């Protein structure tokens, strides 16, 4: 049986551009997302950016995006590109690291 959390959620694809690789950005994202009950994944891109799939309530995802900009002192995020993923996208079980792309 699905919980209410699984029935009503948004999915956002986010690309963090700037000094976001080699500074612990992905590990920090995983810890923060799991603590906030956000599901999805994070991975490095060959262009030097970090890409994330975020799933949760609009409020959770907006908070995560604010944190992505300023929550990691060693990183310098110049830009966040956010795209909403249209339903139906299946709810992921947890927040994980994917291989680089």
Swiss-Prot record:
The active site is at 26, 44. It is an enzyme of class 3 (hydrolase). It catalyses: an acyl phosphate + H2O = a carboxylate + phosphate + H(+). The keyword Repeat does not apply. It holds the Pfam family Acylphosphatase. InterPro entries: Acylphosphatase (IPR020456), Acylphosphatase-like_dom (IPR001792), Acylphosphatase-like_dom_sf (IPR036046), Acylphosphatase_CS (IPR017968). PROSITE patterns: ACYLPHOSPHATASE_2, ACYLPHOSPHATASE_3. GO terms for molecular function: acylphosphatase activity. Residues 11-99 form the Acylphosphatase-like domain. Its EC number is 3.6.1.7. Keywords: Hydrolase, Plasmid. It comes from the Bacteria. Belongs to the acylphosphatase family. This is Acylphosphatase. The lineage of its organism: Bacteria, Pseudomonadati, Pseudomonadota, Betaproteobacteria, Burkholderiales. The gene is acyP.
């Amino acid at each position: 049986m699905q919980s209410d959390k699984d029935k009503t959620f948004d999915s956002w694809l986010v690309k963090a551009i700037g000094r976001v690789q080699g500074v612990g950005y992905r590990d920090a994202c995983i810890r923060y997302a799991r603590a906030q009950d956000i599901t999805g994944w994070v991975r490095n891109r060959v262009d030097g950016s970090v890409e994330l799939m975020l799933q949760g309530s609009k409020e959770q995802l907006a908070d995560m995006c604010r944190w992505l900009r300023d929550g990691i002192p060693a990183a310098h995020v110049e830009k966040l590109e956010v795209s909403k993923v249209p339903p139906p996208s299946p709810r992921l079980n947890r927040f994980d690291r994917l291989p680089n792309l």
